[in-house]
């Protein structure tokens, strides 16, 4: 007699870089016969329903999205990017959303209970609304909680020679200063929710709270952790477009033959959140405007977006509003982007080295430091690059074989990790 699969209650903060990896794995679970309820913001309702999930919306403070964050965290407009802003964002955006997140999670669990079914919760690093479960807050309990690591790991790590940007995050005093306000807020919130246990230091609680923590990267892209909790393990990257069974674009752009025939293809994007094309994309176009043997494809990151009329697009450049990375990257020599964690995984899954221009914005320094440490990336160390800086970086990466060699090594490592299988194994263990 077959064991009935638990209902999966997936949860993600309503930001593209957080929803994307969870939804990618959820699609795989749906294909394997799981029923999925997805808790996230209304901005992602359509995507969640299209995937085949039951949608449960976040409410109030938790229902934000990329473009209205200053409304709930006005300090983002005045505090410069860096550690202070990181600590502020952690508290104002993520910790203070816990009550509404937990409320939505309970709504989802009640729906599952009403059908006399069991549930396993799958969250992601910054969906802190799963913490009340392990801390004894009143409410329904799932059979287990799995958290997916959708951002660079924040556990204590050994020093990494040659990566000075990591030093502040390793220093215990700095970690305490930056994240103590968030820790204090979480303690107060847990009291309000009726939790019977007090949370640990915030950065530790994120990893010790779930039954299983699956970091979505291979070991080679993470610093050597000093003391990860028992449930922590690596799971490789989330399935990308093709491996997740999604359809390729219904029609390729008219310039697609140019991609296939290009001697050298450079792909550049600024992601979907921090979009000022003058920071990185336009300088990249300008950097190679006179190189006939190079094709530059710029992805604007938002459907319907276009460059200002004042921007002259070089003859060797092609601009597209929105396009799957996995269609272009197999043909690319280098990927220039703003340092999102998912973008790094996408690029390296195709063996393509990266150039990162994210400056000190949110988790971008953490991603860049790992790319540099692993030898697969070049950090521009600024949010506002010049064409000269971009040109210098690309020339160094293309002229240094080790970048490509190490990127290919990570690609092979990623191929050994079957993230969907690893996730399903964890689900089975908790549901048995």
UniProtKB/Swiss-Prot annotation:
Alphabetically ordered keywords of this record: Glycosyltransferase, Transferase
Keyword Transferase: yes
Gene Ontology BP, a term: lipid glycosylation
Family: Belongs to the UDP-glycosyltransferase family.
Function: Catalyzes the second glycosylation step of sophorolipid biosynthesis, the further glucosylation of the previoulsy formed glucolipid to give rise to an acidic sophorolipid.
PANTHER family tied to this protein: GLYCOSYLTRANSFERASE, UDP-N-ACETYLGLUCOSAMINE--N-ACETYLMURAMYL-(PENTAPEPTIDE) PYROPHOSPHORYL-UNDECAPRENOL N-ACETYLGLUCOSAMINE TRANSFERASE 1
Protein name: UDP-glucosyltransferase B1
Organism, as annotated: Starmerella bombicola
